[in-house]
Amino acid sequence: MIYIIGLGPNDSSNIKENIKNLLLNNTSAKIIARTKEHPAIDFLEQNNILFETCDKFYTESDNFENTYNNIASYILEVAEKNDVMYLVPGHPMVAELTTQLLIKNGKNVKVIGGESFLDSCFNAAQFDPVEGFTLADATAPETLSSVNPHNHLLIT
């Protein structure tokens, strides 16, 4: 089983209690974080929770598509022998390509959501997304040609 778990957009104060409990009470799943470069990782370190990261894949690949494909392949390989808790920043279903790859190629995948970075962005910019907004991928600049200039724009 692969559990894709969202750590929220910033420090451990935004990790949901059910997720904290899953991590603290884990006895058998291998914990793999997409990156150590996220403030919520401190929660794992402060609680002596063993984990590894996928940071090496960022230096081994020359583009994000290859990086995320390699991460997903690695998670799927590990999941053949162990349950995996794969930790991602924010919410697993928001701007997280590895989630889509794992859902598409995995057998048993469960998504456990955390707070999305979008919540913080909407709050900081003080607008309601129902007013209209576009979320664009900075690695795919061709998508910017279809942006509605009357909508709020967030480029990730």
Regions found by a protein language model. Give the residues of each.
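Glycine-rich, highly charged phosphate/nucleotide-binding loops
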Residues: 63-75
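Short, charged, surface-exposed secondary-structure boundary motifs
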Residues: 14-15, 41-43, 60-66, 119-123, ...
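Glycine-rich, flexible N-terminal cofactor/catalytic loop recognition
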Residues: 1-58
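Short helix-loop-beta junction
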Residues: 46-50, 105, 126
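Ligand-binding beta-strand-loop-alpha-helix segment within the catalytic cores
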Residues: 76-79, 99
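Beta-strand/loop-alpha-helix module characteristic of Rossmann-like adenine-cofactor folds
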Residues: 2-5, 10, 22-24, 29, ...
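Short glycine-enriched loops at secondary-structure junctions
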Residues: 36-39, 90-92, 115
